[in-house]
Amino acid sequence: MHSSVFILILFSLAVINPIFFDMKVEAGCMKEYCAGQCRGKVSQDYCLKHCKCIPRFI
């Protein structure tokens, strides 16, 4: 019983989390995140303008 509930929770997170995250990406990323992602890139301005957040699964 417990394992099926656990699997259901994991599945719902895997399905709902990306949808929720896409909505947050539309609103824009944290500047610190984009600065970290674009550091050392040749086209830093382009990178910052087109920066997208990538969800990290813990």
Curated annotation (Swiss-Prot):
It comes from Tityus serrulatus. It is found in: Secreted. The lineage of its organism: Eukaryota, Metazoa, Ecdysozoa, Arthropoda, Chelicerata. Expressed by the venom gland. GO terms for cellular component: extracellular region. Blocks potassium channels. The keyword Signal applies. Residues 1-16 form the signal peptide. Disulfide bonds join 29-51, 34-47, 38-53. This is Potassium channel toxin Ts16. Belongs to the short scorpion toxin superfamily. Potassium channel inhibitor family. Alpha-KTx 20 subfamily.
